């Protein structure tokens, strides 16, 4: 079976009415438009998303009237920065922008993959951060407001 569109989000489904099969993906896999997956029941499915469709943690595909395939995302260690004020947010954004690392900004925190160079720069600039195990709802992404290139 090949799915071409996300039918719903698990949070919007009455899970008591369905048998749920789960696939756990890496956050990087959420960026893929074409992927082959194997559920926790051993069933294989293809996902070839139509234009405009995106995977996220909790994406759901209806297999039939009684079965749903749910997408989960594995946790990963990430650098988590909670800037103490707008000045630190600006400095941090400038530093991270220069590294061209994919990030996620959510709930006044900045998330990015663990990187020893970034850790060293944050430490040198005395910007507090932690390493936390996080499950991302969406993949980290590059902020590209323009076609900026070096």
Swiss-Prot record:
Record-linked Pfam families:
UreE_C, UreE_N
Q: Which family does it belong to?
A: Belongs to the UreE family.
What broad class describes the main subcellular location of this protein? cytoplasm
Which BP terms does GO give this entry? protein folding; protein-containing complex assembly; urea metabolic process
The record lists the organism as Streptococcus thermophilus (strain ATCC BAA-250 / LMG 18311)
* MF terms in GO: nickel cation binding; unfolded protein binding
Supply the Gene3D superfamilies for this chain: Urease metallochaperone UreE, N-terminal domain (2.60.260.20), UreE, C-terminal domain (3.30.70.790)
Keyword presence, Membrane: no
Encoding gene per record: ureE
Q: What does this protein do?
A: Involved in urease metallocenter assembly. Binds nickel. Probably functions as a nickel donor during metallocenter assembly.
Cytoplasm: is it a keyword of this entry?
yes
Question: What's a single GO CC term here?
Answer: cytoplasm
According to its UniProt record, where is this protein located?
Cytoplasm
UniProt keyword list: Chaperone, Cytoplasm, Nickel, Nickel insertion
Q: What is this protein's name?
A: Urease accessory protein UreE
């Amino acid at each position: 079976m090949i799915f071409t569109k996300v039918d719903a989000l698990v949070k919007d489904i009455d899970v008591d009415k369905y048998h749920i099969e789960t696939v756990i993906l890496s956050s990087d896999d959420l960026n893929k438009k074409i992927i082959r997956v194997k559920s926790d029941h051993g069933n294989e499915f293809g996902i070839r998303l139509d234009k405009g469709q995106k995977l996220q943690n909790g994406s759901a595909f209806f297999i039939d009237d009684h079965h749903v395939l749910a997408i989960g995302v594995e946790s990963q260690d990430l650098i988590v920065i909670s800037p103490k004020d707008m000045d630190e947010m600006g400095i941090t954004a400038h530093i991270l922008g220069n590294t061209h690392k994919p990030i996620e900004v959510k709930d006044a925190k900045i998330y990015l993959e663990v990187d020893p160079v970034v850790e060293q720069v944050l430490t040198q600039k005395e910007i507090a951060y932690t390493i936390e195990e996080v499950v991302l709802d969406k993949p980290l992404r590059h902020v590209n407001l323009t076609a900026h290139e070096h």
